[in-house]
Amino acid sequence: MCIRDSSTTKYMDGHGAVLGGAIVDGGKFDWMAHAEKFPGLCTPDDSYHGITYAERFGKEGAFITKATAQLMRDFGSMQSPMNAYMLNLGLESLHVRMQRHCANGMAVAKFLESHPKVAYVNYCGLESSPYHALAEKYLPNGSCGVVSFGLAGGREAASIFMKELKLAAIETHVADARTCCLNPASSTHRQMNDEQLKAAGVPAELVRMSCGLESAEDLIADIAQALDKI
């Protein structure tokens, strides 16, 4: 992988308090070998003393230098000092929080997989997942805290389930210290009919749950009581 961009709003912050992103440049791509495709890096930048980034900084630093020196100047994508401070606080506890997120995600996924009112569970940490082998290879320390599942009763069951949750927050956010739950059919994708939802990969019965830092027992108890109301 040559370049990776990530949202710092999610697990890095971990508390839904910061908006931001990060770019990680691996410094391995030979820009000059594909100069015709990347004129912004391989021709002089008249706005910055005529520098040709790929020649001056090589493949190790061309992209990230242009991003910080020219693009950030033009787009104004500077993070405020307060946001930077809060993000740094989140990073200091990231390794501890991720252990809990992953453990809670696995516990919730296993509970849902065994429940008769749940039609299916999407979580690569489960042995039943078609992506389990990949998760074992690339995510040996845990498969994150986000679980999606479909309720056997369809759209109506999903609606009842969402309304009956007591502990989980109903919101579109993920990767938060608090558990967040979403039914796309009634929120982010509500303009679509059932056929369109299925084609988009978010069928009407689908619920996405981002498991927070609460105790797994409390999360499962909340899920169980909501399922009982269906």
Give a label for each model feature.
Residues 6-9:
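Short beta->alpha connector loops at strand-helix junctions that form conserved
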Residues 12-146, 150-180, 185:
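Active-site C-terminal subdomain of aminotransferase-like
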Residues 97, 163, 179-230:
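PLP-dependent enzyme catalytic core of the Aspartate aminotransferase-like
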Residues 1-3:
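Short, small-residue-biased leader/transition segments that mark boundaries at the very start
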